[in-house]
């Protein structure tokens, strides 16, 4: 019967749409949706279970309960379709109309919609220009509002209390009209003339000068203009008719035992209906005003709760004191409609099971349990059974499959052949968390996974589970095979390095196989080819590690792809010779002629991918894996307690450290060092001692004596024992990178060392024992401290990291490659990244896979090596390196001019595929995943490992690392003192060392107060000191000579006298202004200089006198009236007193950068280029004046406790730092521009990741910065429709400007706005995407008022509305549809599109020899 009914169901045509609009509904509109009015609060009759008439579930309004059957049962069957029963009034139709038919409630009194009232900023308040508090007082019947003042002195919109109103009525009678409640607000809205209001505001906007006012007017103007444009009437924000949700969407289900389970909405609706009916009755009875008012207020509250429970006043609760879930709660939050049902759908044809290792699989295969496959591929099996004639109907086929006969298994084998399945492991942090494999059937119930893909899935076999999904359609299968097959995903999209890299056992096996042993069996034998070596090894004539000579065949791949064989004799080991058998043709033997550690193997696979292509590499990786496992098994490496060799020197090292500590303690007791210094030094001593023990241990582990064939110690000619690299199992595991690290081995056999407390501070007594000797109770207890902290941190970290990824994905989800070339000539000048004199990232790494924005010129001949628009691959960057070019301008995502997307040329190479990115690639999501995925590896905060900190602090000089010529940057300033030393007086001077070709080799920051050991333009040798300084104090140096004159230096007021107990010398120390008494707070202790005539020395080229301010904690070393020369020290600041500012590190730092938060005590940048002088100080602030080149002066007030790095008379350029402190990204953007900002964010983010050893390509960060900068602020509206100060999408401004210019108008000018990722996600054009991210209510409220249209450009919106996403193959589909809609036949166009998407099909199963 059911199948028969299906024939009659009308096939509903799927609607095709291009955009979704949201707007306020008018009362008429609501009535037009409705199928009738709900008049009674009853739901269903508890005896008959039939819905009550006119109730919330009424069948007459909403439709029948059963298909094609009216309620009283008079009409049944299909033949009566469409009849309306005259007895019960129910239309005979499908029962599913109860999911779509709405009803309405006619409200007896209008009610304000709470979203437009309470969602901040209040829209009602904005339109009426009345404060929210006042509107609430009117709505909730606490005050009257004047609607029509008539001939009275009252004004429209004025509030009157009850008493006011009565006195005014006595005074003026019925001249004026004042009302309370929603009727009043509705009347005000209805009688408002939007048009004149807008004109008035536009006029005001032009006249006013105050910032705050402009902001306020612009906001109001935006809303009013939206009302005008979209044709939405403001009075619709007040409801007269309330729509009722279809009953199937708020079901009422009878439970056994006569109780009902119901949706909270029914309760909320019942309250509204009850109060509404009561109000109607009261109005009919002409009840006293006060009772009616109370009922109206209750109705307002009931409707408020229905729409958004708990937004105002008390939360409505059900019978069990639980808050009721309102309509707003249904759509927002993680469990709401958007994130739970639209973005988090469950899919059919999927299963999950535990994974086990499948070492015999090929890279593109997985093992699928038979039981699972049978269930997943059921429809295919049914079809096959029918085709083969083994079953006549689906039912018969079903039965056959349930019997699981032999023919079913044969068919299953047939069905899954070449049909890829998708495997996914949660959490899916990047696109490699879902990959396609060809299933092979296995017994048992566990999925078998190829070991090499574990790194991509971050899987291990300790009970992890994975989900299997079946791509059904042919297109889906093809995409899975060409794009997602594991063998096509060799490279990581985050950094372009191979991700299919052997680890653990495989590494150990390969390492063991390629090590060499001295005096091993068969050393020095010669072999004609590898086959002979294999035979000798199999018969035990020669040891795996023996040095032998062998002839090997290698293949050179010519340029034209021809392979040329050459035979060479190599002296190598047996293991390496055997390994050479699996080397792909085209790779030289030299790449494996070394002990293969993990890093080496990674390089090997990378080289293979670049030289012989993906297919050979995949086969090679598989063979490496099989070989590694085989030899790891043969090696039989195991560890025992005797492998942990404790160094004999350990006792003595610890004893000497203890003696040093005792000495420090004695110094502390006698008052020579402070508590802080003592702590730092003790921690430092133990840190060093631990390192020494570790070094001794590693040295002992690293070497062993060689035994000859008889087991005697082998000796060389002089009779000394021969040593070789150790075959100690623990050492081999750590050295090869298979498991463990030097730090862990150190804990096993050295000493555990210093431990951290949960707050990150170091406990100064270290654990001197190791795990081999065992810990005592105290040591064990100290260990638990750090361990517990680690576990707690991990849990927090995972949540935080996931949230960061979510925000990143949300801000970039609509960024897709939409065109090939946007034609811009902009880009970023890129050079090698140098930190502290070391090249952290060379130029070739930074420009690899980018497109040149300008011609790359040969520095010697100035001829074009690579024209602009060239994609720089490995060969090109090597060539650029060889030519010694040190700066290249490359295209970048930041400067791409494509609107709604990005162009392939600006993005450059697709890192996961190794060639120029394809059209339709979702680069935004890839960027977000690449940055978010390593998030869990980042620490929550950087610990100051005390030892590390104090050792870093005691750097006292910079040395050159290479030979070359020294140059100082323009910011370097120094003076020569009486001793002829050159003392640096600039804060950010740098010394650059260039080689003979003038290329920059290294650059070093030279701190203030350092003594230069070299002069500008002179040659230096490697290792030569460039500058030295005292690491423990920061000096304050005078640039001018003269006689010292103190100002405000008063003992006991601004400075305190300190007498050193040991030496008896006294010195003056500046007191913290916060601790000073009343008047003296504003005094600044400073020094002026007088010349021979007693006149104040002036700043060179200026009128201001030289004055040097002493800051907090300064120890003043000069006396009043003392003569000082240039470059002499006036005072010094002890370094330990200036506390190490706690650096935010790890994950919070990355989040802080992407959220573009201004740091707490940010430094100040110069707003203009000019000369600095100091003005008159105010209370607590110092006044700094910059006089620009036109002589205009700009004043800045700076808190006293801030340290001004600039000094009187200094010339600063716009954007230069003048006050110490972390940079504020907003300032960088405003003063130095987008490129500087991008560079700042990229460098800072990379610093955090580099610290953890994570590689991420810069372009991912650039993509995110592009999204953070996509909004602009209008600085001059010109003839466009924008409002001054409005924030809009950059693309919209450009489009609008083009339109205006075409009509010879004046375009709008704008400045870039930097938004944090959360803000940027919420301010996107797509309201669907923003609403599903955060603050759903606010987003939807705003969108409804503006009558917003969502063009469905991003990925997220399309997922939500259930269309193909406009990325990948979906992009071509949408383009074609758009062309079809435009009426252009587009068959050829899609072929061209497909041409752009080069799919590399790797054959299904590469045969492994």
Swiss-Prot record:
Zn(2+) 1 binds at residues 70, 72, 85, 88. Binds 1 Mg(2+) ion per subunit. Binds 2 Zn(2+) ions per subunit. One of its GO terms (molecular function) is zinc ion binding. Zn(2+) 2 binds at residues 822, 896, 903, 906. Keywords: DNA-directed RNA polymerase, Magnesium, Metal-binding, Nucleotidyltransferase, Transcription, Transferase, Zinc. Its EC number is 2.7.7.6. SUPFAM superfamilies: beta and beta-prime subunits of DNA dependent RNA-polymerase. CDD domains: RNAP_beta'_C, RNAP_beta'_N. It comes from the Bacteria. Its cofactor is Mg(2+); Zn(2+). One of its GO terms (biological process) is DNA-templated transcription. DNA-dependent RNA polymerase catalyzes the transcription of DNA into RNA using the four ribonucleoside triphosphates as substrates. The RNAP catalytic core consists of 2 alpha, 1 beta, 1 beta' and 1 omega subunit. When a sigma factor is associated with the core the holoenzyme is formed, which can initiate transcription. This is DNA-directed RNA polymerase subunit beta'. It comes from Methylobacillus flagellatus (strain ATCC 51484 / DSM 6875 / VKM B-1610 / KT). The gene is rpoC.
């Amino acid at each position: 019967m059911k199948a028969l009914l299906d024939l009659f169901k009308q096939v509903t045509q799927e609607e095709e749409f291009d955009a979704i609009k949201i707007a306020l509904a008018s009362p008429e509109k609501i009535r037009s949706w409705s199928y009738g009015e709900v008049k009674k609060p009853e739901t269903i009759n508890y005896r008959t279970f039939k819905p009550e008439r006119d109730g919330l579930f009424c069948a007459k309004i909403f439709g029948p309960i059963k298909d094609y059957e009216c309620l009283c049962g008079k009409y049944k069957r299909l033949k009566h379709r469409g009849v309306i029963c005259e007895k019960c009034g129910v239309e005979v139709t499908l029962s599913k109309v109860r999911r779509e038919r709405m009803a309405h409630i006619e409200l007896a009194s209008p009610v304000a919609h709470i979203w437009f009232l309470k969602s901040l900023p209040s829209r009602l308040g904005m339109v009426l220009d009345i404060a929210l508090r006042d509107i609430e007082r009117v709505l909730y019947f606490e005050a009257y509002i004047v609607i029509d003042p008539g001939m009275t002195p009252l004004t429209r919109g004025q509030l009157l209390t009850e008493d006011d109103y009565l006195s005014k009525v006595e005074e003026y009678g019925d001249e004026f009209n004042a009302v309370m409640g929603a009727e009043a607000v509705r009347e005000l809205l209805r009688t408002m003339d939007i048009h004149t209001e807008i004109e008035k505001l536009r006029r005001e906007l032009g006249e006013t000068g105050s910032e705050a006012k402009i902001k306020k007017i612009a906001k109001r103007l935006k809303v009013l203009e939206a009302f005008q444009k979209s044709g939405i009437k403001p009075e619709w924000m007040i409801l007269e008719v309330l729509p009722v949700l279809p009953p199937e969407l708020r079901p009422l289900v009878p439970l056994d035992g006569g109780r009902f389970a119901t949706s909270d909405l029914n309760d909320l609706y019942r309250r509204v209906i009850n109060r509404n009916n009561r109000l109607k009755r009261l109005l009919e009875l002409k009840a006293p005003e006060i009772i009616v008012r109370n009922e109206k207020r209750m109705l307002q509250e009931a409707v408020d709760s229905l729409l958004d429970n708990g937004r105002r006043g008390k939360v409505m609760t059900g019978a069990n004191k639980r808050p009721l879930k309102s309509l707003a709660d249904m759509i927002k939050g993680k469990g709401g409609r958007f994130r739970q049902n639209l973005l988090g759908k469950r899919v059919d044809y999927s299963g999950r099971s535990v994974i086990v290792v499948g070492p015999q699989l090929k890279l593109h295969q997985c093992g699928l349990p038979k039981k699972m496959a049978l269930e997943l591929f059921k429809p295919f099996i049914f079809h096959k059974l029918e085709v083969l004639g083994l079953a006549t109907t689906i039912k018969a086929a079903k039965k056959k499959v349930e019997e699981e006969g032999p023919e079913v298994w044969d068919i299953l084998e047939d069905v899954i052949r070449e049909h890829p399945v998708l495997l996914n492991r949660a959490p899916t942090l990047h696109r490699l968390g879902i990959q396609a494999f060809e299933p092979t059937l296995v017994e048992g119930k566990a999925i078998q996974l190829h070991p090499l893909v574990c790194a991509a899935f971050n899987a291990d076999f300790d009970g992890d589970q994975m989900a299997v999904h079946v791509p059904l359609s042919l297109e889906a299968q093809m995409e899975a095979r060409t794009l997602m097959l594991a063998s096509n995903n060799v490279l990581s999209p985050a950094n372009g390095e191979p991700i299919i890299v052997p680890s653990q056992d495989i590494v150990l096996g390969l390492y063991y196989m390629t090590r060499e042993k001295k005096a091993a069996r068969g050393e020095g034998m010669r072999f004609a080819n590898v086959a002979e070596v294999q035979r000798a090894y199999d018969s035990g004539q020669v040891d795996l590690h023996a040095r032998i000579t062998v002839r090997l065949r290698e293949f050179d791949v010519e340029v034209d792809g021809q392979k040329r064989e050459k035979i060479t004799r190599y002296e190598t080991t047996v293991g390496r010779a055997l390994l050479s058998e699996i080397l792909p043709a085209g790779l030289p033997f030299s790449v494996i002629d070394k002990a293969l550690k993990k890093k080496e193997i990674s390089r090997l696979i990378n080289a293979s991918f670049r030289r012989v292509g993906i297919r050979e590499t995949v086969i090679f990786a598989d063979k490496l894996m099989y070989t590694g496992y085989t030899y790891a098994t043969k090696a039989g490496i195991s560890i025992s307690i005797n492998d942990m060799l404790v160094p004999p020197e350990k006792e003595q090292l610890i004893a000497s450290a203890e003696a040093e500590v005792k000495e420090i303690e004695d110094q502390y007791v006698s008052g020579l060092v402070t508590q802080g210094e003592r702590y730092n030094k003790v921690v430092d001593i133990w840190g060093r001692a631990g390192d020494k023990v570790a070094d001794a241990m590693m040295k002992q582990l690293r070497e062993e004596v060689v035994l000859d064939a008889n087991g005697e110690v082998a000796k060389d000619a002089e009779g000394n024992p021969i040593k070789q690299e150790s075959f100690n199992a623990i050492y081999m595991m750590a050295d090869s990178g298979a498991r463990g690290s030097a730090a862990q081995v150190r804990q096993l056999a050295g000493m555990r060392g210093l431990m951290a407390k949960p707050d990150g501070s170091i406990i100064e007594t270290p654990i001197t024992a190791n795990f081999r000797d065992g810990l005592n109770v105290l040591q064990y207890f100290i260990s638990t401290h750090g361990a517990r902290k680690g576990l707690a941190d991990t849990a927090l970290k995972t949540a935080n990291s996931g949230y960061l990824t979510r925000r990143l994905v949300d801000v970039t989800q609509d960024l897709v490659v939409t065109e090939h070339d946007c034609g811009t000539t902009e880009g970023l000048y890129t050079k090698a990244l140098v930190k502290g004199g070391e090249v952290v990232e060379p130029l070739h790494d930074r420009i690899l896979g980018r497109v040149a924005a300008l011609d790359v010129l040969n520095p010697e001949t100035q001829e074009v090596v690579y024209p602009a628009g060239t994609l720089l691959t490995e060969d090109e960057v090597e060539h650029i390196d060889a030519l010694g070019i040190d700066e290249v301008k490359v295209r970048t995502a930041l400067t791409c001019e494509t609107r709604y997307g990005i162009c392939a040329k600006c993005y450059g190479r697709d890192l996961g595929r190794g060639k120029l990115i394809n059209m339709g690639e979702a680069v935004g999501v890839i960027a977000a995943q690449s940055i978010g995925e390593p998030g869990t590896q980042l620490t929550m905060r950087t610990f100051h490992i005390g030892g590390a900190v104090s050792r870093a602090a005691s750097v006292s000089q910079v040395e050159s690392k290479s030979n070359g010529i020294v140059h100082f940057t323009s910011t370097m300033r120094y003076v020569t003192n009486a001793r002829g030393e050159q003392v640096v007086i600039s804060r950010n001077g740098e010394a650059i060392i260039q080689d003979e070709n003038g290329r920059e080799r290294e650059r070093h920051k030279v701190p203030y107060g350092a003594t230069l050991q070299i002069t500008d333009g002179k040659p230096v040798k490697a290792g030569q000191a460039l500058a030295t300084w005292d690491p423990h104090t920061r000096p304050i140096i005078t640039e001018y000579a003269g006689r010292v004159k103190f100002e405000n230096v008063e003992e006991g007021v601004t400075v305190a006298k300190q007498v050193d107990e040991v030496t008896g010398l006294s010195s003056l120390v500046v007191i913290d202004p916060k601790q000073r008494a009343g008047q003296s707070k504003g005094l600044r202790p400073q020094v002026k200089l007088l010349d021979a005539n007693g006149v104040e020395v002036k700043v060179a080229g200026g009128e201001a006198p030289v004055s040097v301010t002493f800051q907090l904690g300064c120890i003043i070393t000069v006396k009043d009236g003392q003569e000082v020369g240039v470059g002499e020290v006036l005072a010094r600041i002890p370094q330990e007193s200036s506390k190490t500012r706690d650096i935010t590190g790890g994950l919070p730092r990355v989040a802080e950068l992407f959220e573009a938060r201004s740091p707490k005590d940010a430094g100040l940048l110069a707003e203009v280029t000019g000369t600095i002088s100091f003005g008159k100080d105010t209370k607590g602030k110092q006044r700094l004046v910059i006089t620009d080149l036109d002589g205009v002066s700009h004043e800045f007030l700076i808190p006293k406790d801030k340290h001004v790095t600039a000094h009187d008379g200094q010339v600063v350029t716009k954007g230069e730092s003048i006050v110490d402190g972390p940079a504020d990204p907003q300032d960088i953007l405003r003063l130095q521009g987008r490129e500087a900002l991008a560079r700042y964010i990229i460098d800072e983010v990379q610093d955090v990741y580099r610290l953890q050893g994570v590689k991420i390509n810069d372009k991912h960060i650039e993509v995110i910065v592009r999204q953070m900068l996509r909004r602009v602020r209008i600085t001059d509206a010109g003839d466009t429709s924008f409002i001054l100060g409005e924030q809009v999408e950059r693309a919209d401004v450009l489009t609008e400007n083009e339109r205006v210019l075409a009509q010879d108008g004046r375009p709008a000018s704008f400045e870039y706005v930097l938004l944090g990722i959360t803000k940027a996600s919420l301010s996107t054009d797509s309201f669907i995407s923003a609403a599903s991210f955060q603050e759903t209510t606010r987003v939807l409220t705003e969108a409804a008022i503006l009558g917003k249209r969502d063009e469905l450009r991003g990925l997220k919106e399309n997922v939500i509305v259930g269309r193909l996403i406009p990325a990948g193959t979906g992009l071509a589909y949408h383009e074609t549809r758009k062309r079809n809609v435009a009426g252009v036949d587009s068959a050829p166009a899609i072929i061209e599109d497909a041409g752009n998407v080069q799919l590399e099909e790797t054959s299904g199963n590469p045969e492994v020899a």
